[in-house]
A protein has these predicted regions:
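Flavin (primarily FAD) cofactor-binding/catalytic cores of flavoenzymes
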Residues: 1-45, 49, 93-196, 200-350
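Short, hinge-like loop/turn segments at secondary-structure boundaries
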Residues: 55-60, 234-238
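Short alpha-helical interface elements
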Residues: 55, 63-66, 109, 242
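FAD-binding beta-loop-beta segment adjacent to the flavin cofactor pocket
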Residues: 54-56, 67-71, 344-350
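A conserved beta-strand/loop capping segment in the N-terminal third of enzymes
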Residues: 70-104, 272
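N-terminal/domain-start segments enriched in small and hydrophobic, helix-friendly residues
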Residues: 34-35, 41-42, 60-77, 86, ...
């Protein structure tokens, strides 16, 4: 919610910084617990979650039960099923027989939970956190204290340093895709990044109607293939509480090794997306050939992007097997290169 009923309260058992999915889950689970006075503050004016990546047809990559609270407390008032019931659409949702939840629906569910929870406050930014027997928090509106704090400020878009100075209307991170994809007709588009977001952009461009479609789409990935997400049964055991407890006790080098070995449990492409892409490529290559120039290149590492002639971009990359340098001209470059941890400048007092 944008206003707080707790403006007069200055001390809390728990104060959360940020109200994205992680802290929103915590806020949902401690809601109504009298022994746990709590407030969650977010500097944004309202809830948002990858709003500029809500491509038509994009779906969630995990089970609907992996919502804010079901696996911890199925009776909690902020479950996805509670959202469907509150909105009067639970029967329609069941009858729709979705194989995967529409991502926009899940985004709306998260926004609903944030609005329903009066302990979640938007438009209040934490500026500094200090500690003197209790945590002392300074926001853009007031000063508070708390016995415990939960940091959940999320991540921010990542691009290589050499690209950051060139970001704009024709070269941008995928997090800006819905803002800046309106002028692809007749253009050469290069997508960099072989994960789910890169796959969704590639599929979206392939599916653009005739007359609005790019003349060429070039998709580059460092990986050896466009690998699927590992959502198999035993792999999902990694995300059970018992394994989390075990994992947290491992030494740092083993935790890092485990994360590297299992990156495709969270960073692969949905099977349904891969299937749609392959079927679309089949149609464009064999049924209606010659309409668009398509290139998929794996085992390539982009080393630079330079301004070329006629306001184009020259994308330079290395073949990881042969070490040969290659390049491609593009009118539009989309970086689907993931996210990195947000800087926590407000912790300077600690």
């Amino acid at each position: 919610m944008t206003g707080s009923r707790k403006d007069v309260q200055s001390h809390f058992k728990l104060l959360g910084v940020g109200a994205g999915p992680a802290n929103l889950s915590l806020a949902s689970l401690v809601y109504g617990k009298q022994e746990m006075s709590n407030i969650f503050l977010d500097g944004k004016s309202s809830f948002s979650w990858h709003d500029d990546q809500m491509i038509d047809g994009a779906t969630l990559q995990v089970s609907l039960f992996k919502d804010l609270s079901t696996l911890t407390d199925p009776t909690n008032k902020f479950t996805f099923l509670a959202y469907l019931h509150d909105k009067g659409r639970i029967y329609h949702f069941i009858n729709a027989q979705f194989d995967e939840i529409p991502r926009r629906e899940f985004r709306n569910y998260l926004a609903w939970a944030a609005e329903k929870n009066e302990n979640v406050v938007f438009g209040e930014k934490v500026l500094n956190v200090d500690f003197d027997n209790v945590f002392k928090i300074v926001t853009n509106k007031r000063e508070l204290t708390a016995d415990n704090i939960a940091i959940g400020v999320g991540t921010q878009p990542w691009v290589p340093e050499f690209a950051s100075a060139h970001l704009g209307q024709t070269q941008f991170h995928v997090s800006k895709y819905m803002q800046r994809n309106s002028s692809v007709a007749g253009k050469q588009v290069t997508i960099i990044g072989g994960g789910q977001s890169g796959a969704e952009v590639f599929l979206d461009l392939l599916s653009t109607p005739d007359g609005e479609r790019p003349v060429g789409i070039h998709w580059i990935s460092r990986r050896r293939n466009f690998f699927p997400i590992d959502d198999s049964t035993f792999t999902n055991d990694f995300y059970m509480p018992c394994y989390s407890d075990y994992f947290n006790k491992l030494p740092l080098h083993l935790r890092q090794q485990t994360n590297r070995e299992n990156i495709l449990t969270s960073d692969g492409i949905s099977e349904s997306t891969l299937r749609q892409i392959y079927q679309k490529l089949y149609s464009l290559n064999f049924i209606t050939p010659g309409q668009i120039d398509i290139a998929l290149q794996t085992s390539r590492s982009v080393s630079n992007v330079k301004l070329g002639g006629n306001n184009t971009w020259r994308v330079e990359y290395c073949h990881l097997d042969s070490a040969d340098m290659e390049s491609k001209e593009a009118d539009i470059v989309v970086w689907a290169t993931g996210y990195t941890a947000t800087e926590k400048h407000f912790l300077g007092g600690l």
